[in-house]
Amino acid sequence: MKYKPVHRFDMSPKDMIKVQKQLAKEVKLIHFSDEPNLVSGVDLSFPKDEGLAVIVTMDFKKLSVIDVTYAVDKITLPYIPGLLAFRELPIFLKAWEKLEIEPDIVFFDGQGYAHPRRMGIATHASFFIEKPTIGIAKSKLIGEYEEPGKKKGEFTFLYHKDEKIGIVLRTRDNVKPVFVSPGNLVDFNNALDFTYHFATKYKIPEITRKAHLYTQSLKQR
């Protein structure tokens, strides 16, 4: 799959923040009205000085894996809190270029709109791949929320500075919730409904859980 080269990645942290703020003005949290057909889940890992990006594409209705694409490359940027996308996107885009199946929506193991500058990896990536995106995170980055009920499917909203930025979703009874946020070109209802569709028997929804399992398997090779 091709992507739009929105900006370069070798810049100072100060310039990275400027880019985030500029792109944040262009985020569109709009309703995705169709039922997806094919969707992809993305997981990234950084063993030693390398980056590994895995894209798992699944049939939305059947919940079946139809493709696994990955890329490995050297990592040049250190981890900087709040600027993770600048470290992760280059390796993700290498995997994206190898992808031969076009997904309707792309899920990321990470944040979307629930970011200090509303520019988590899922949101940032959408400008390059020009696809609707959703972030599914295991933990909260920022914001305040009321704990959702203990039953599967119960949820509350995550807020930051009085703005709704995400969803705190219980994917299993009596298990810690996941933090879901729209990336771009979807709304909060889409992010909730499409994520919950993949909440089968595990805490982590299948769309990013499968990607993580393949990441762990590839790391052991």
From Swiss-Prot:
Briefly, what is this protein's role?
A: DNA repair enzyme involved in the repair of deaminated bases. Selectively cleaves double-stranded DNA at the second phosphodiester bond 3' to a deoxyinosine leaving behind the intact lesion on the nicked DNA.
**The keyword Iron appears for this protein:** no
Where on this chain does Mg(2+) bind? 43, 109
Q: Which reaction does it catalyse?
A: Endonucleolytic cleavage at apurinic or apyrimidinic sites to products with a 5'-phosphate
NCBIfam families assigned:
endonuc_V_Ttgales
Family recorded in the similarity comment: Belongs to the endonuclease V family.
Cofactor names: Mg(2+)
What EC number(s) does the entry state? 3.1.21.7
Tell me the GO molecular function terms: deoxyribonuclease V activity; magnesium ion binding; RNA endonuclease activity, producing 5'-phosphomonoesters; single-stranded RNA binding
Source species, domain of life: Bacteria
Please state what the protein is called.
Endonuclease V
What is the originating organism of this protein? Petrotoga mobilis (strain DSM 10674 / SJ95)
Leader sequence range is none
Q: Does the keyword Heme apply?
A: no
Which BP terms does GO give this entry?
A: DNA repair
Task: Write out the annotated subcellular location.
Answer: Cytoplasm
* Gene Ontology CC: one annotated term: cytoplasm
- Provide the alphabetized UniProt keywords: Cytoplasm, DNA damage, DNA repair, Endonuclease, Hydrolase, Magnesium, Metal-binding, Nuclease
